């Protein structure tokens, strides 16, 4: 259950009239079926015993980073089949539990007129606020976004302007190239069952002389509204030449 205060409203009436109606109007129920994100790493005991003292800690830190990256990819673009429904997916039209991509808004410029149309669509859904952000792949940021934001002053200084509509920019490799995901990240609901855990087994692979590390995370995610996020295609935006 999560609240949507921007669409809720209070009800005037006699002092002792039904107050439950007023409270429940601001809540929305979501049926979540948790999925598991998991993986394992087998490491030779000799590497741990003969390697640097920090190696065991590094392995655990690396597993955490891999799991976090996998979760980030699912939050942005998960298809909903035993994983979260990502920001870039429609919330209807699933086939065999796989949700389709949202239609992309094609942009040829990153100017006020182009971006304001998307902000107006968010406002139409009562989801436009000061926390709206633009999520973009780092490659696309440098090639398309940065290249169109930086200007040179008559004095020769370079000034990095904000986007015309003022959004903060979030860099994420989970976002496909030539794509912008626009919305308030807080309008994505991520339900988790406890923290991610990493268990170490020293005898499971005894004959192979290996330690086994197994990582598990239980959770699910979905946008709070079908129009919480809009996806823009910036393939047609002129930008920097990226060397191959």
Per-region residue spans from a language model:
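Structural signal for terminal/edge beta-strands and the immediately following C-terminal loop/tail
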Residues: 222, 227-244
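Short helix/loop capping segments that flank catalytic or ligand/cofactor-binding pockets
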Residues: 9-13, 51-52, 143-146, 222-224
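Extended oligomerization regions of viral-like shell subunits
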Residues: 81-217, 241-244
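Structured loops at beta-to-helix junctions and adjacent beta-edge loops in soluble globular domains
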Residues: 2-5, 44, 137-139, 172, ...
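Extended, low-charge hydrophobic alpha-helical regions
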Residues: 31-49, 140
């Amino acid at each position: 259950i999560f609240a949507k205060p921007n669409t809720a409203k209070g009800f005037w009436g006699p002092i002792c009239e039904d107050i439950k109606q007023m409270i429940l109007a601001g809540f929305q129920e979501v049926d979540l079926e948790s999925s598991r994100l998991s993986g394992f790493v087998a490491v030779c005991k000799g590497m741990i015993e003969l390697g640097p003292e920090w190696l065991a800690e590094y392995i655990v830190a690396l597993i955490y980073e891999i799991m976090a990256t996998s979760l980030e990819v699912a939050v942005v673009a998960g298809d909903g089949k035993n994983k979260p429904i990502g920001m870039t997916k429609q919330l209807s039209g699933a086939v065999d539990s796989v949700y389709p991509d949202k239609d992309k808004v094609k942009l040829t410029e990153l100017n006020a007129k182009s971006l304001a149309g998307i902000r107006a669509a968010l406002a139409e859904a009562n989801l436009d606020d000061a926390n709206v952000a633009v999520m973009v792949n780092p490659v696309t940021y440098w090639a398309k976004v940065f290249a169109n934001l930086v200007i040179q002053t008559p004095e020769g200084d370079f000034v990095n302007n904000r986007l015309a509509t003022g959004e903060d920019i979030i860099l994420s490799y989970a976002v496909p190239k030539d794509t912008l995901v626009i919305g308030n990240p807080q309008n994505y609901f991520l339900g988790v069952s406890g923290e991610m855990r990493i268990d170490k087994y020293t005898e499971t692979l005894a004959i192979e002389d290996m330690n086994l590390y197994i990582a598990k995370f239980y959770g699910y995610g979905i946008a709070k509204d079908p129009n919480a996020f809009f996806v823009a295609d910036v393939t047609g935006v002129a930008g920097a030449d990226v060397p191959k």
